[in-house]
Every structure is written in C-alpha cells, then in structure tokens.
C-alpha cells in the first residue's frame, strides 16, 4: 500500500536542542551492571545488544535452573517510549512502518508493542480524522520550499491537537503488560533501583513500578523537532514522571537475589 514514511529521528525531549535517541542508548549501563554481578558470583548471560529476543539482563539464580529477566534503564527519558506515525495514502490513515530505521530503537519497539495492545493507532485516527483533514506534512514533496514547509507545519499544529489516552498509573501499567508479554517482570532504573512489573514472581519484595510513579500518560501529539527548519512529526509517546526510590537496587547490594522473600 502507498505510504509516506516519517524519516525524522526520535528525540529525547522538546526544546531548541533535543538530543537524538541513540541506537545503543543505555548499553554501557548493561555492560557495567553485568560486569558487577559477575564479579559478585552471579551467573549472567551476555548483554542483549541488538537482540530484541533477549532481555537487557538475564540471570540464572542459584536456587533454580531458570532464567530471570530484567529490563534496565540508565535513566527515565523525557519520553519513556515513543514512535513517529507514518501515513497510508491509500486509506488516508496514520500507520506505522516497523521496518524503518527509527523503529529499530528500543524506545520505538516498546511503544509499538504498547500501541498494538492498547489500540493507539486506532485512537489517533479516530481523534485526528485524517481522512477529513489530510496532514499537510504528508502532502509535501522533497522539492517543497522552506516557506511551504513552515506553512504546512503551522497548519498541522492548528488542526491536530494533542490527546491523552491514559493518565495516572494506567500508562505505567501498559508498560508492565508489554514487558510481561516478554516474560520480564523486573525493571532496574539507575539511581532509582529495582521494581517489579505486574507481579513479583521471585518474591524479592521490591515495590511495584506502576505504583511508584507520580504520573504517567500515553499521548498523541505533534512534536516540533526544529521550528527554523520546519521539521515535525506526528508522535505517540509514553511519559513517566516522579518515580520514587526502591528499597532494592542491583547497583548496590544485590544479595537479595540469592534468597528471595527472606
């Protein structure tokens, strides 16, 4: 089907100089934590790297011959997960091209997984009604002038308002469901510690992730990447703020991994 692909990179945050999200963001944190745990005698698999089938950290405990998976976050970015919408010019609806370069980043893969389970693309098409209001961004050609692009940007900002699809702890719970579908029930955030997602199958006694955030939301919006160069995207993103500190932290004392529930 004919498509207009949004080739804009994914950026962490707004403002005049947002930083592009790198393909290997957080990889050094994976390496450092794996090294630390191995030095402490834990059996840990090699880093996941680009292997999306593996968790960031996979540990085999001494008390059972079964891998325990952990998601690792070096930081809570401005957008926990995000992905730019593309546009299907035959059906005149927003869509997602999973094969484009930006879709291969972890922030995008997480967002796509949540989008599919939550129906975010359907919600975006229902809210924005692109069949009636064709996004000006996707009518531009490669030869469009800067003035034409600026006019299109201004028009899209006027016609496509933001919408929040989940607030409170609901978005954080969607994050938990996504990782649970990958058999991952724990998330370690640098500087915050370890949290369980959905349930605590190992009985570590750490706090629940979705109960430890002050606010979370799923948002569809236009994100301006550069006003001066008229670069923007139609975006879906999960924002998580105010994560409290956990009583458990893999970066500090990880001995609780040896005797869970005790």
Language-model features: locations:
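A short, highly charged nucleic-acid-interacting micro-segment common to nuclease
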Residues: 2-32, 47-50
């Amino acid at each position: 089907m004919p498509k207009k692909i949004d080739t804009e990179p994914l950026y962490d945050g707004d403002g005049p100089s947002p930083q592009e999200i790198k393909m290997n963001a957080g990889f050094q944190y994976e390496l450092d934590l794996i090294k630390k745990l191995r030095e402490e005698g834990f059996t840990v698999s090699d880093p996941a790297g680009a292997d999306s089938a593996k968790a960031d950290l996979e540990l085999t405990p001494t008390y059972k011959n079964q891998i325990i998976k952990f998601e690792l976050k070096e930081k809570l970015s401005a957008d926990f997960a995000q992905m730019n919408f593309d546009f299907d010019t035959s059906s005149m609806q927003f869509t997602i091209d999973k094969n484009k370069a930006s879709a291969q980043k972890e922030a995008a893969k997480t967002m796509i997984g949540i989008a599919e389970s939550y129906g975010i693309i359907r919600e975006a098409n229902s809210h924005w009604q692109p069949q009636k209001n064709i996004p000006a961004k996707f009518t531009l050609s490669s030869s469009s002038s800067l003035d034409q692009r600026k006019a299109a940007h201004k028009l899209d900002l006027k016609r496509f308002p933001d919408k929040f699809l989940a607030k409170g702890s609901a978005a954080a719970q969607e994050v938990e469901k996504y990782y649970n579908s990958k058999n991952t029930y724990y998330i370690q955030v640098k500087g915050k510690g370890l949290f369980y997602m959905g349930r605590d199958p190992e009985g570590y006694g750490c706090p629940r992730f979705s109960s430890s955030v002050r606010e979370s939301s799923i948002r569809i919006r236009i994100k301006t990447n550069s006003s001066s160069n008229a670069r923007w995207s139609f975006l879906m993103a999960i924002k998580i703020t105010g994560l409290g500190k956990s009583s458990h932290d893999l970066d500090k004392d990880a001995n609780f991994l040896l005797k869970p529930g005790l």
